[in-house]
Structures are given as C-alpha cells and as structure tokens.
Design a protein with these regions (language model features):
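N-terminal Rossmann-like NAD(P)+-binding domain of SDR-like oxidoreductases, especially those catalyzing
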Residues: 1-150
Length: 150
C-alpha cells in the first residue's frame, strides 16, 4: 500500500538509504533536513537511482513553526525520524545543545504529527542507550544505562 512518509534527517547516511528503499517501494517521500551533517547531493543521487522524485524541505526540527507547516502541508501517513545530533563526545561537551535538538526537536515533531492525526513513527535510536555493560545482540526489552547526554 502506497504511503506518504515524512523523513526527518533524510539527507544523512541512514536517512538517504531509507529514502532510497521507500521510493523503490513506490511511497511518496518528503525529506525535512537542515543539512548540518548531510548534503542534498545524497538525495539527488537517490532520485537518479530510483528515477523518482521526492520532496525536500530545508528546515530544522528545533523550529516548531516551520516543522509544523511542512507536516501540515504534506499530511503524512507515517514519520521516520533520523534528525538529531549523534557524537557522544560532543554531547558531553555540549549537553544542552544535544537536549535542545534531540529532545525538544523530537517533541516538536510529535506535536506537529498530533495536529494532523499522524500516529505512526519510527525513531532511529542508538545502541549507546544500553551502556557499556551490555554485550550485543541488544534487544529493546533490555534495561537502559546511558553513559552520555547523547
């Protein structure tokens, strides 16, 4: 079944590969990315490979208004959330910046989704939430033990 999927951080490494597969599966895709740790060229190549177009909005998840407008205009069936800061060492040096982007930005996304009754989200997390004491393979039911603000 064809869906409209809103992808935050879609120009990044993981996000662009997900967009590639979504387009191959014939979904409509809108990417919302500030291009801080990514580049538009990745999306252009995804379009070349699939011979399909995706929509792109240059924006930051910290900007609740712009994010809300993009989601309202697109009215997605689902959201795939890859936007965020990801360097563990930097998160220790700049914890408030990481909180602002990763927590507040995610809250902005959830608020925007709520306004258009979009209830499906896939969130890309990290194995670092399980800490250093756990050995792979990790399972979602394992207790978390984060060692950094990330």
């Amino acid at each position: 079944m064809k869906k409209k999927i809103f992808v935050t951080g879609g120009a990044g490494y993981i996000g662009s590969h997900v967009c590639l597969e979504l387009l191959r599966e014939n979904h409509d895709v809108m990417v919302y990315d500030n291009l801080t740790n990514s580049c538009y060229e990745a999306l252009r190549r995804v379009e070349l490979i699939t011979n399909r177009k995706l929509s792109f909005v240059l924006g930051d998840i910290k900007n609740e208004s712009d994010l809300g407008d993009a989601i309202y205009d697109f009215k997605p069936d689902s959201v795939m959330h890859f936007a965020g800061l990801k360097a563990v060492a930097q998160s220790v040096l700049h914890p408030l910046q990481y909180y602002d982007v990763n927590v507040c930005g995610s809250i902005n996304l959830l608020k925007a989704m709520d306004k258009v009754d979009c209830t499906e989200i896939i969130f890309s997390s990290s194995a670092t939430v399980y800490g250093e004491l756990n050995d792979p393979p990790f399972r979602e039911i394992m207790p978390v033990n984060p060692v950094s603000p990330y």
